[in-house]
Amino acid sequence: MVLAAPLLLGFLLLALELRPRGEAAEGPAAAAAAAAAAAGVGGERSSRPAPSAAPEPDGCPVCVWRQHSRELRLESIKSQILSKLRLKEAPNISREVVKQLLPKAPPLQQILDLHDFQGDALQPEDFLEEDEYHATTETVISMAQETDPAVQTDGSPLCCHFHFSPKVMFTKVLKAQLWVYLRPVPRPATVYLQILRLKPLTGEGTAGGGGGGRRHIRIRSLKIELHSRSGHWQSIDFKQVLHSWFRQPQSNWGIEINAFDPSGTDLAVTSLGPGAEGLHPFMELRVLENTKRSRRNLGLDCDEHSSESRCCRYPLTVDFEAFGWDWIIAPKRYKANYCSGQCEYMFMQKYPHTHLVQQANPRGSAGPCCTPTKMSPINMLYFNDKQQIIYGKIPGMVVDRCGCS
């Protein structure tokens, strides 16, 4: 019995020595550390000390992590904006002062129109990246085609309908011109050119009757002085009409073109038959194509009602007015998003070497954290501390994708 007591004590000490040392680090504190890392930008982990674990609402531990991640993300956004704008503190400009300063400032509508301010608009599920491979469209020439029978009376007018592909209709039109060839005149003359928008026949008129079923809506009228005995190409600004067609494609039934001289002769070449080759009306467009293409988002996307426990991207709207930051002119709010969730060792990490190190020494590291793996900038129009209006682009303010790293 005397020898058994020291032997039993030795076994107990050996069991304590062989107990896994990483078990004490797991639990609520580790979860809080993961939430703090999720609030960082570009995978950087926050140096903020991990707070004490909050009580779990309705037995939902992931809800606690998620709420803590939201709070850390909002505080991180505030400090990042001030830091990236090189401001020591938020400019002390109230809403009343902003109202007084804005009318004295240069016209801001042009800046708001030219630059994309991410505000209340919904963000697409897939992030956009620059397309550096495909050719971009700059100029589009659309030749006149025959009109639909629904807008014809006794087979007239046959011209002109212009067809545009969906790709062109989703571009930004910088300039649109309609080109019409006018026949030569024997002597100088004044020509009255008019363009009428066509609409389908109504129930009151028929193809052979005089019920006036087809409605003409005048959209352009020009007075042209012709002095040359040779033919003349006349261009007409058509951008406004084109915008209307692109917004409502069903309203594009075509147009009718007339150019009458004093004797009533129509000088506009609108015939699509033989003898008028190369003289048909056409539309010239200068467009700015969106060079960004959609790419499949490899990270998980969740909403606030999701029960997902893995690393996921959640929606978060930043409201500058709620902050009391009236010095920001635009946007007043934007969708920032945040990362939250657990990262298990069994999942491959962002960098292969990280995964290998953790596999070789699983107890020797703090473990992977759910952090942003791709971020994008926002444009901002704001007052600085000298009450000057500044336009700038702030990088890394929108979480596009989350991952474990």
From Swiss-Prot:
UniProt-annotated glycosylation sites, renumbered to this chain: 92
Location(s), subcellular: Secreted
Predominant place of localization: secreted
Record has Transmembrane as a keyword: no
Chain positions of site Cleavage: 119-120, 296
Gene Ontology molecular function: any one: cytokine activity
Signal sequence region: 1-24
SMART domains named in the record: TGFB
Biological processes per GO annotation: activin receptor signaling pathway; amacrine cell differentiation; animal organ morphogenesis; anterior/posterior pattern specification; camera-type eye morphogenesis; cell population proliferation; metanephros development; negative regulation of amacrine cell differentiation
Keyword list, A-Z: Cleavage on pair of basic residues, Cytokine, Disulfide bond, Glycoprotein, Growth factor, Secreted, Signal
Prodomain residues: 25-296
Post-translational modification note: Synthesized as large precursor molecule that undergoes proteolytic cleavage by furin-like proteases. This produces an inactive form consisting of the mature C-terminal portion non-covalently bound to its cleaved N-terminal propeptide. Activation of the mature form requires additional cleavage of the propeptide by a tolloid-like metalloproteinase.
Disulfides per UniProt: 302-312, 311-370, 339-402, 343-404
Cellular component aspect of the GO annotation: extracellular space; protein-containing complex
Disulfide bond keyword on record: yes
Assigned protein family: Belongs to the TGF-beta family.
Function: Secreted signal that acts globally to regulate anterior/posterior axial patterning during development. May play critical roles in patterning both mesodermal and neural tissues. It is required for proper vertebral patterning and orofacial development. Signals through activin receptors type-2, ACVR2A and ACVR2B, and activin receptors type-1, ACVR1B, ACVR1C and TGFBR1 leading to the phosphorylation of SMAD2 and SMAD3.
Subunit structure: Homodimer; disulfide-linked. Interacts directly with ACVR2B. Interacts directly with ACVR2A. Interacts with ACVR1B, TGFBR1 and ACVR1C in an ACVR2B-dependent manner. Interacts with FST isoform 2/FS288.
Protein name, entry field: Growth/differentiation factor 11
Organism in which the protein naturally occurs: Rattus norvegicus (Rat)
